[in-house]
Amino acid sequence: MFTASPMSLSKILARRDWENPGVTQWHRLPAHAPFNSWRDEASARADDNASRKRSLNGDWQFSYYAAPEQVPDSWVTEDCADAVTTPVPSNWQMQGFDTPIYTNDTYPIPVNPPFVPAENPTGCYSLTFEVDEQWLESGQTRIVFDGVNSAFYLWCNGKWMGYSQDSRLPAEFDLSAVLRPGTNRLAVLVLRWCDGSYLEDQDMWRMSGIFRDVSLLHKPHTHIADYHAVTELNADYDRAKLQVEVALAGEQFADCEVAVTLWRDGLSVATVSAKPGSAIIDERGNWAERLNVTLPVKDPALWSAETPELYRLTFALRDGQGEILDVEACDVGFRCVEISNGLLKVNGKPLLIRGVNRHEHHPENGQVMDEATMCRDIELMKQHNFNAVRCSHYPNHPLWYTLCDRYGLYVVDEANIETHGMVPMSRLADDPRWLPAMSERVTRMVLRDRNHPSIIIWSLGNESGHGANHDALYRWVKTTDPTRPVQYEGGGANTAATDIVCPMYARVDQDQPFEAVPKWSLKKWIGMPDETRPLILCEYAHAMGNSFGGFAKYWQAFRNHPRLQGGFVWDWVDQALTKKDDNGNAFWAYGGDFGDTPNDRQFCLNGLVFPDRTPHPALFEAQRAQQFFTFTLVSTSPLVIDVHSDYLFRQCDNEQLRWNIARDGEVLASGEVALTIAPQQTQRIEIDAPEFAAAAGEIWLNVDIVQTAATAWSPADHRCAWDQWQLPAPLYIAPPVEGTAKPDLKVKEDVLEVSHQSQRWHFDRASGNLTQWWNNGTATLLAPLSDNFTRAPLDNDIGVSEATRIDPNAWVERWKAAGMYNLTPRLLLCEGEQLAQAVTITTLHAWESNGKALFLSRKVWKIDRAGVLHGDVQVQVANDIPQPARIGLSCQLAQTPQTASWLGLGPDENYPDRKLAARQGRWTLPLDALHTAYIFPTDNGLRCDTRELTFDTHQMQGDFHFSLSRYSQQQLRDTSHHHLLEAEPGCWLNIDAFHMGVGGDDSWSPSVSPEFILQRREMRYAFSWRQD
């Protein structure tokens, strides 16, 4: 039995355990399945709060020091004079101590493993708690820390109890020897840096403290020490065996018996009792303290992410008189995970992984996760058709897995290992001195989490190269848990240490032949000789800011190539932290905003949702691409569609198809049909379409699938899938528009003035621009209508380029080098002509930089008898410059419209390579809703393929993209944070005939697909504009 140490604090610290990779713990108890230590079966079955598990969360005393050596020896027994109250769990950086540091892969400390800086911020926590004599005499008392970053020492009642590192797994200690009836005192010394920090180089905020739950756990003297349940299914999946192993501990275990019972809806399905003692396993005998039992189950309800059917399994330990000593319990899901014929399968069905990577992040609480936030994340994921989550890049809070079991998500559980900043990356993975530390991070994860049905894949970690340590750990996991595959991307994504080819940021059709670790195109990879494993991207579609272009291409490939089984989007939530400015106003901060160095700026903003879980527009693109129903227009006369269910296990029993036929947004007919589609089957639906009269406008069939009743993760009427098709319509001949008076041209010294009834247009003869437009005496322009060839750079345009490290290959650097952000117009022609029924103004501009013409823009403006301004624009692009971001026009309007209405793609922001989620229709939104508040400001708010646009007195027609914003492109370009943007007078209107895609395969290299780059060197467009 462990005896608490009387050594002083300074003597214990003098050993510098935190700089010894061979020391990962002192006196920490072995890993096991989570415990609650119920004392009756009913409570365990109901998962009620256990009276013998007491939370120690709450207010603790806290003192902060710059280094552990500064902590006085007396702190072990009494608080320091400067102690303050701090909440546990929390990160101390979020409580006003020390600095949070955001870096992607650069280590935040000098790289000299296993040594860390002498200046090593140290947090000293203390808490007093009460226990009575009966509690102490009736069993063992343990303390459980679910997460402490990065290493800590523990004292109780002045006695040193132990040490632990690995910030993302529990550390459990036996306090029994030092507890006393009445008041007891805990003291926890937490170090910011330890040698384990070299294994925790994940792309995240680097923070410290006791950031997960702390609890006291009371176990009887003889108790359950571990349990493990494995489900086995027959080939027809209608018979199951539940193989259960239970380990006991304590002096009297041999006299005890364990009743193992499987429950379903409160009823016992199967039960068996057994005494400890395993079968003989070798020449030395058996495990005396273990027992193995089998529970047969007929017609089991199978678990999947679609149908998260759960049973409850209880383990009741009884003494020789039949009295219950200890009860543990867990949820059980009957499911089989396997790889066969090159496919990852659950219950015999090949999966299509609709996955996302998720960091544990909260804008106010840092890395502290509460149940409400976890539930919200899962609900949003399921509402947007995700079925899988990767715990990037560490084991999560224990509750997360229980929620995934119950809501239904497939989980990749990942070890807390990343050495991204090492050179080479595999330096520690190939060093046997680091094998114990790496081993504990993998083995303890498996032993804690292996009972969860949601976990279908183990991951050995992230971006740590590939070394002999990985091979050893792979073999241990496969031996310990042969029921799950193992994945690991490091070393090229297809080493012998992975059952799944799991690259990150491989592209659909483009090879990236990096030296040593090439990334082949997805289609090529699965066809390579001797490669028979499934391919699932562990990271793809880097959703940084205004990004996610080309996501539909991935999903086309996934649906067309069975061994391309999906992937995990990077990533779920923008990792911004709430900070207050000098005026006390809160804003979302990113790398560098806390004075943290080194830092990687806004590279932490890669989420599909904002920090408060408000969706980015990209989330809707994922929802549409990943939807579980596909549609086919079979015929238009009669009007027939097929609806196919991609569900593998779910019978449609809560879905309804709602359809309407609309002309330019006006509904002509509608209806609804109940869906009764079996898994992977199709339902044919004939729609009673009316005869269409000849009229202006396009006719569209719109179909939505909605859930009629609320579910555990969605409200009633939640739309889970949709599609639309343009239908043939009778030819319509529009009558000519007749005006009452022809426009009049006046050639003045400085302007060409066109008048028509209550309207006047001024074309400046020096600039050639439309500088003012009066309507009923009101000036409508604050800045002239002028050519627009650039955009406020997106994160994907910037790539890794920054002031101290220019990437000449980044789009923004290529545009800068060509002079596109410093264009000067030179007017070559400006003339007006009075026609019989109209006035035309013709201009020709050369847009130059450093005396070189980059663009030629010829515009012919025509004002007709109806007072409509028609624009016909031809643009030539120089052959030796990079392709531009846009071809269009921009102006600043004098009025600020309250709303805008348009006929085109909407309602949400969409771009040419990210418009799968956009729907053709007529939409109306407030002006502010047309702006996307990306934390790092960029071009935003575009709506594509617009036929009509109406706001205030303005009406525009044509085929164009538009954005309306309170902020100019220049301000968006110059401003570092969204909260620093200042609304400008009026409103900025951008009309684009052509706009480059946003890209998104990754955010550090040009990733816009060729078809979404403006390759043509001559372009022409036209539109009309009128005011009422």
Swiss-Prot record:
<feature type="active site" description="Nucleophile">
    <location>
        <position position="539"/>
    </location>
</feature>
<dbReference type="Pfam" id="PF00703">
    <property type="entry name" value="Glyco_hydro_2"/>
</dbReference>
<dbReference type="GO" id="GO:0000287">
    <property type="term" value="F:magnesium ion binding"/>
</dbReference>
<feature type="binding site">
    <location>
        <position position="606"/>
    </location>
    <ligand>
        <name>Na(+)</name>
    </ligand>
</feature>
<feature type="binding site">
    <location>
        <position position="203"/>
    </location>
    <ligand>
        <name>substrate</name>
    </ligand>
</feature>
<feature type="binding site">
    <location>
        <position position="203"/>
    </location>
    <ligand>
        <name>Na(+)</name>
    </ligand>
</feature>
<keyword id="KW-0479">Metal-binding</keyword>
<feature type="active site" description="Proton donor">
    <location>
        <position position="463"/>
    </location>
</feature>
<feature type="binding site">
    <location>
        <position position="603"/>
    </location>
    <ligand>
        <name>Na(+)</name>
    </ligand>
</feature>
<feature type="binding site">
    <location>
        <begin position="539"/>
        <end position="542"/>
    </location>
    <ligand>
        <name>substrate</name>
    </ligand>
</feature>
<dbReference type="InterPro" id="IPR011013">
    <property type="entry name" value="Gal_mutarotase_sf_dom"/>
</dbReference>
<keyword id="KW-0326">Glycosidase</keyword>
<keyword id="KW-0915">Sodium</keyword>
<dbReference type="InterPro" id="IPR008979">
    <property type="entry name" value="Galactose-bd-like_sf"/>
</dbReference>
<dbReference type="InterPro" id="IPR013783">
    <property type="entry name" value="Ig-like_fold"/>
</dbReference>
<dbReference type="InterPro" id="IPR032312">
    <property type="entry name" value="LacZ_4"/>
</dbReference>
<dbReference type="InterPro" id="IPR017853">
    <property type="entry name" value="Glycoside_hydrolase_SF"/>
</dbReference>
<dbReference type="InterPro" id="IPR023230">
    <property type="entry name" value="Glyco_hydro_2_CS"/>
</dbReference>
<keyword id="KW-0378">Hydrolase</keyword>
<dbReference type="InterPro" id="IPR036156">
    <property type="entry name" value="Beta-gal/glucu_dom_sf"/>
</dbReference>
<dbReference type="Pfam" id="PF02929">
    <property type="entry name" value="Bgal_small_N"/>
</dbReference>
<dbReference type="InterPro" id="IPR006103">
    <property type="entry name" value="Glyco_hydro_2_cat"/>
</dbReference>
<keyword id="KW-0460">Magnesium</keyword>
<dbReference type="InterPro" id="IPR023232">
    <property type="entry name" value="Glyco_hydro_2_AS"/>
</dbReference>
<dbReference type="InterPro" id="IPR004199">
    <property type="entry name" value="B-gal_small/dom_5"/>
</dbReference>
<dbReference type="InterPro" id="IPR050347">
    <property type="entry name" value="Bact_Beta-galactosidase"/>
</dbReference>
<protein>
    <recommendedName>
        <fullName>Beta-galactosidase</fullName>
        <ecNumber>3.2.1.23</ecNumber>
    </recommendedName>
</protein>
<dbReference type="InterPro" id="IPR006104">
    <property type="entry name" value="Glyco_hydro_2_N"/>
</dbReference>
<feature type="site" description="Transition state stabilizer">
    <location>
        <position position="359"/>
    </location>
</feature>
<dbReference type="GO" id="GO:0030246">
    <property type="term" value="F:carbohydrate binding"/>
</dbReference>
<dbReference type="InterPro" id="IPR014718">
    <property type="entry name" value="GH-type_carb-bd"/>
</dbReference>
<dbReference type="InterPro" id="IPR006101">
    <property type="entry name" value="Glyco_hydro_2"/>
</dbReference>
<comment type="similarity">
    <text>Belongs to the glycosyl hydrolase 2 family.</text>
</comment>
<dbReference type="GO" id="GO:0005990">
    <property type="term" value="P:lactose catabolic process"/>
</dbReference>
<feature type="binding site">
    <location>
        <position position="606"/>
    </location>
    <ligand>
        <name>substrate</name>
    </ligand>
</feature>
<dbReference type="Pfam" id="PF02836">
    <property type="entry name" value="Glyco_hydro_2_C"/>
</dbReference>
<feature type="site" description="Important for ensuring that an appropriate proportion of lactose is converted to allolactose">
    <location>
        <position position="1004"/>
    </location>
</feature>
<feature type="site" description="Transition state stabilizer">
    <location>
        <position position="393"/>
    </location>
</feature>
<dbReference type="GO" id="GO:0004565">
    <property type="term" value="F:beta-galactosidase activity"/>
</dbReference>
<feature type="binding site">
    <location>
        <position position="599"/>
    </location>
    <ligand>
        <name>Mg(2+) 2</name>
    </ligand>
</feature>
<feature type="binding site">
    <location>
        <position position="463"/>
    </location>
    <ligand>
        <name>substrate</name>
    </ligand>
</feature>
<feature type="binding site">
    <location>
        <position position="463"/>
    </location>
    <ligand>
        <name>Mg(2+) 1</name>
    </ligand>
</feature>
